[in-house]
Structures are given as C-alpha cells and as structure tokens.
C-alpha cells in the first residue's frame, strides 16, 4: 500500500521507514528506526531523486507507481551512491527501461563497482554548476565530496527553492507519517538523534561540511525546503538547524556544560563521579550529564561529547592501562575528529595508578585543540573524606574554566 506525502505542489516524498533495522551501518543502535527518503517530481518530465535501501524497495515502488499514476519515469537523479539510498537503482531501471540517469562521474564509477547494469541506459554526467531543466523546474548541482562519500552532491531546485541535501541535514529516526520537522517537537524528540547522526555519518569531515555550508551560503535566501535522505524535511526554521550543523561541523560545543564519563568495576570510581556531579550542581552548574562507559553505546557518548564544552574522564586503572571501554571512547573521539573541549581527569587504582597519566597523554597527543585542567582527582581504591578538598578544587577548576 502506498504511503506518500506532498512536499510542494509538484514534489512528493516516496520513501520508506525502517523499524526492523537494529544497527545503522551495522554499527549504531537506532531504537527509533530510520527513514530512507526519496522524492518524485512531476513536471513536463518526471524525476525520481535517489532510491532507498533494498529492504524498503517494495514500498518505494508502490509509492512511485501511485504518484506517477501511469506516467513513465523520465529521469533518475542520484545524489549519493551509498546502498541505503542506491540499492534500488537497478530495480528502477528494470521497471522503467527508458529512464535516463543523472549523476556525476564518480557516482557512475561506483554504480559499476556495485554491479549496477547502467551502461545500457542513457547516463547524463553532470558537474558542479551545471543546470538541467525538467520543464518549469530547473535544478543546479553542487558538489559535496566527503559529505560523506567522495561522489556525494546536492541538488537545488531553483524554481521552488528545494535543496536535495543527500546525507547532510539528516538524522536517525523513522518519520511514521510526520514528514516535516515542524510536525514534531524536533528539539525535544529529534535533536539528540540528529547530533548522534552527524558525527558518526559525516562528523569526521567537518571541513567538508563547512565548505558545503559556505557554498550554500551564496544561495541561502533561495532555499525554502531542505529534503535530506534521512529524517524530516525542513520548511520552517531552516536557519536554526543549519546553525546546529555549522556548530557541530566546526567542532564547537553546543552548550556550556559537563559530560562525565566513568569506567568503574566495583562502583568506587562511579561514586567519585557522582560526588563530582553533585558538587557541580551545588555550585550552580545544572547542565551535567553522566554515563557509565561500559553500559552506554559509544555513539551516545560521542553525541554528548559534541554537545558539551567540558568532559570529565573518570577511569579505574586496568592491567596498568586505561579501562578498555574508556579507551574505546577515546579512540572514537579521535576517529571522529572531536576538538575544542576542556577535559578533567579522575583516576583510580588500588596499586600502580596509571589511568590518569595515560588518559592525559592520549588527549594531549592524539586529540586536537584540547585543554586538560591541571587539577586532578587521584584515588586509591575508593574516595574517602580526605579527598573531598581535591574534589571541590576540581569542581571549582571546571567552573572557573567556563568563564
């Protein structure tokens, strides 16, 4: 059964929602599901913008058949070749043998690498700055390499001001009928997933996002809709969400606050983390988030690291090293290029306490533009009252560094 939504008078959402997939890219938990967005334009010529994951192909085909209502599909325009958006290309070609493909040189190379039989079809190769008309609608193409694949591009319908943004401005979460961001409480229900999406999907490539935003800045007044390949369509408050992407891709903190991530085997390091959180709140800093590194998926920790200005690493020493799950968190921060944060350290161990020095060395040597506070809380097995002064000094140092 078809499930479509009208975006503009001539444009329809023909994508699908997926609540069956547990791990996006087989890595990231998506308890709220995910959407695969595709769009169909009805003009003198008909155009399908991207396809969907193979698991949702039937839904796409039913949606497309309903919107076309007996018309032929004239063009398939492909902005991004990742299989969750391109897997149905060959099925579209089989069902619409006269369809013409529009994409760029690298995209056509990837189509052939994935084994799509496109050579029997007319392939129209475009590059940045080119325009193409489908009737009253004219589109122009903007390269978006490494946002987050090398072939990625975005397409602007200059007639209606619709930006087909590929994976940029996307988010985890299934739409379930609510296509537009203004139909949901985005800040309450979606922002965390958007922030979790960005660093893991495109966050390593912050400079490339900044380049795309710079390009978009020249036509920002023309953009009335943002149609990403995942998540809601934006038709209101576009500037608010663009500003979020700008903040995240510059690796600037979204808010002044403290993320406390602790690694605790028997609860003693956790107790110290709790004591620090309590002290910070007592001193007026209520924006404090605390997570057990062992029971929290690292993608959630990274999302919070992109949110907060200050990060406290509290780790027990394990085999004369950093606790393994904490080390994984550090490695992910490095891989995803997190920058411009202030760190504080709590270390613990019953003998040969090493975790603090090792965490500080990692932050200093492996991460970029980071500050580590001189104050450190060092514990021997557990936190006693004799350590209260050190803990309060650490809390004061964190708050002082925010001024």
Where are these regions (language model features)?
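Conserved beta-strand hairpin/beta-sheet module of binuclear metal-dependent hydrolase folds
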Residues: 4-66, 154-157, 161-165, 269
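Metallo-beta-lactamase
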Residues: 5-9, 103-152, 208-211
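Active-site metal-binding motif and surrounding structural segment of the metallo-beta-lactamase
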Residues: 44, 55-102
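Structural motif
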Residues: 45-47, 75, 137, 161-164, ...
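Active-site neighborhood of phospho(di)ester-bond hydrolases with catalytic His/Asp-centered motifs
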Residues: 49-51, 73-81, 101-104, 163-167, ...
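Short acidic active-site motifs
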Residues: 88, 296-301
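Active-site-proximal loop/helix segment associated with metal-binding centers of metalloenzymes
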Residues: 148-152, 160, 168-204, 249-254
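FMN-binding flavodoxin-like domain, especially the glycine-rich phosphate-binding loop
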Residues: 175, 186-226, 231-233, 275-291, ...
């Amino acid at each position: 059964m078809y499930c479509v939504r009208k975006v503009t008078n001539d444009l329809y959402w023909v994508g699908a929602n997926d609540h069956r997939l547990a791990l996006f890219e087989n890595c990231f938990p998506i308890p709220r599901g995910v959407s695969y967005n595709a769009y169909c334009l009805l003009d003198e010529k008909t155009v399908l913008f991207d396809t969907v994951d193979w698991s949702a192909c039937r839904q796409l085909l039913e949606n497309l058949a309903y919107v076309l209502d007996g018309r032929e599909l004239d063009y398939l325009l492909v902005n991004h070749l990742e299989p969750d958006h391109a897997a149905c290309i060959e099925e579209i070609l089989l069902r619409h043998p006269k369809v013409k493909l529009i994409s760029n040189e690298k995209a056509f190379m990837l189509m052939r690498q994935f084994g799509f039989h496109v050579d029997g079809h007319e392939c129209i190769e475009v590059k940045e700055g080119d325009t193409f008309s489908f009737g009253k609608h004219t589109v122009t193409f903007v390269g978006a390499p490494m946002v987050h694949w090398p072939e990625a591009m975005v397409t602007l319908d200059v007639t209606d001001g619709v930006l087909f943004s590929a994976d940029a401005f996307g988010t985890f979460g299934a739409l379930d009928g609510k296509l537009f961001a203004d139909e949901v409480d985005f800040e309450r229900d979606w922002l965390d997933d958007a922030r979790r999406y960005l660093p893991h999907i495109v966050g390593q490539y912050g400079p490339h996002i900044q380049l795309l935003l710079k390009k978009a800045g020249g036509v920002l007044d023309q953009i009335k809709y943002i149609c990403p390949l995942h998540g809601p369509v934006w038709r209101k408050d576009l500037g608010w969400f663009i500003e979020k992407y700008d903040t995240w891709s510059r690796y600037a903190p979204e808010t002044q606050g403290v993320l406390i991530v602790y690694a605790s085997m028997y609860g003693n390091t956790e107790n110290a983390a709790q004591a620090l959180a309590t002290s910070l709140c007592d001193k007026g800093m209520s924006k404090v988030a605390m997570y057990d590194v062992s029971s929290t998926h690292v993608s959630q920790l990274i999302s919070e690291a992109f949110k907060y200005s200050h990060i406290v690493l509290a780790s027990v020493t394990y085999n004369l090293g950093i606790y393994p799950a904490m080390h994984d968190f550090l490695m992910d921060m490095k891989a995803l290029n997190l920058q411009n944060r202030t760190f504080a350290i709590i270390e613990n161990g019953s003998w040969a306490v090493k975790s603090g020095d090792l965490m500080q060395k990692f932050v200093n040597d492996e991460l970029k533009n980071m500050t580590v506070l001189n104050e450190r809380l060092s514990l021997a097995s557990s936190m006693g009252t004799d350590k209260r002064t050190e803990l309060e000094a650490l809390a004061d140092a964190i708050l002082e560094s925010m001024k």
